[in-house]
Amino acid sequence: MNRTDELRTARIESLVTPAELALRYPVTPGVATHVTDSRRRIEKILNGEDKRLLVIIGPCSIHDLTAAMEYATRLQSLRNQYQSRLEIVMRTYFEKPRTVVGWKGLISDPDLNGSYRVNHGLELARKLLLQVNELGVPTATEFLDMVTGQFIADLISWGAIGARTTESQIHREMASALSCPVGFKNGTDGNTRIAVDAIRAARASHMFLSPDKNGQMTIYQTSGNPYGHIIMRGGKKPNYHADDIAAACDTLHEFDLPEHLVVDFSHGNCQKQHRRQLEVCEDICQQIRNGSTAIAGIMAESFLREGTQKIVGSQPLTYGQSITDPCLGWEDTERLVEKLASAVDTRF
């Protein structure tokens, strides 16, 4: 009889279960308290109960655990310095959606060479998240599919659904199940209505199929996530200006949703020129000084060293520099955070 299935499958490998990985890298009571408390603080900011600003900042993607931990240690110092004005959360992105092809992140390809040692990548991701949380720094990530989140979601304080997946039904269903607040990016064309629709969908109860912590396919029914919000990330043109934010708030108001959102300084808002994140910051700071309460948070891409680099065979990489989108360097990061804290002073 002719085979009719898996005709284009080149390789099958068994995967560690989320439960097995959690046994190897368990959540300590201290980390559990830290994650729970940071989620509650973020929820209060998104609801307008806390006047502070949520600042989600870090590398475009994680590829080097040593550099990531050095960044986290520096970020913890900034958290301590500005905690009365800012809730600083580290961007820890392990999966990268690609427009066509390219490196898909630490979980998929931890060795950066196409060997796809996914089990090792999952170990590295969970290990790093534990270490960063143990420092006292909350973590943020993008949830790209229905499987990998099961391995790390218990260590995440804030999650994102990306511009390419906000319109996806399964991602909206997943967001309705996540235990952390979730931001939905506007579409790559700049359309914010799809993000508002996603927020509405994620607040509802859903049923979907997914592996559970033991790897068993399971029917999940969710209770809905009340902490969905828009991430203004720009599109064909930037959408961080006051009139753009007002228009987004009008749409939120139309559906009786909280009129609080997050502005992404990077991506479409900087038109892929990383130093323009500083210009976006200046504009957002002025809006805050002018009395805007809609801006609950910001996102920015920064690392130890400015710019980006390409992976070229076995050539050594520059330490602390992105291998995906270009990032601001550390000195600019300090300046950006200081400006945000100064602007937020006017809310108190």
UniProtKB/Swiss-Prot annotation:
GO biological process, one term: chorismate biosynthetic process
Organism domain of life: Bacteria
Signal sequence annotation: none
Group of enzyme by EC: transferase
One Gene Ontology molecular-function label: 3-deoxy-7-phosphoheptulonate synthase activity
Pfam families: DAHP_synth_1
Reactions accelerated catalytically: D-erythrose 4-phosphate + phosphoenolpyruvate + H2O = 7-phospho-2-dehydro-3-deoxy-D-arabino-heptonate + phosphate
UniProt cross-references to InterPro entries, sorted A to Z: Aldolase_TIM (IPR013785), DAHP1/KDSA (IPR006218), DAHP_synth_1 (IPR006219)
Amino-acid biosynthesis as UniProt keyword: yes
Involved pathway(s): Metabolic intermediate biosynthesis; chorismate biosynthesis; chorismate from D-erythrose 4-phosphate and phosphoenolpyruvate: step 1/7
Keyword Amino-acid biosynthesis: yes
GO cellular component: cytoplasm
Family: Belongs to the class-I DAHP synthase family.
Note: There are 3 DAHP synthases, AroH is feedback-inhibited by Trp. The other 2 DAHP synthases are Tyr- and Phe-sensitive, respectively.
Function of the molecule: Stereospecific condensation of phosphoenolpyruvate (PEP) and D-erythrose-4-phosphate (E4P) giving rise to 3-deoxy-D-arabino-heptulosonate-7-phosphate (DAHP).
Protein name per the record: Phospho-2-dehydro-3-deoxyheptonate aldolase, Trp-sensitive
Gene, per the UniProt record: aroH
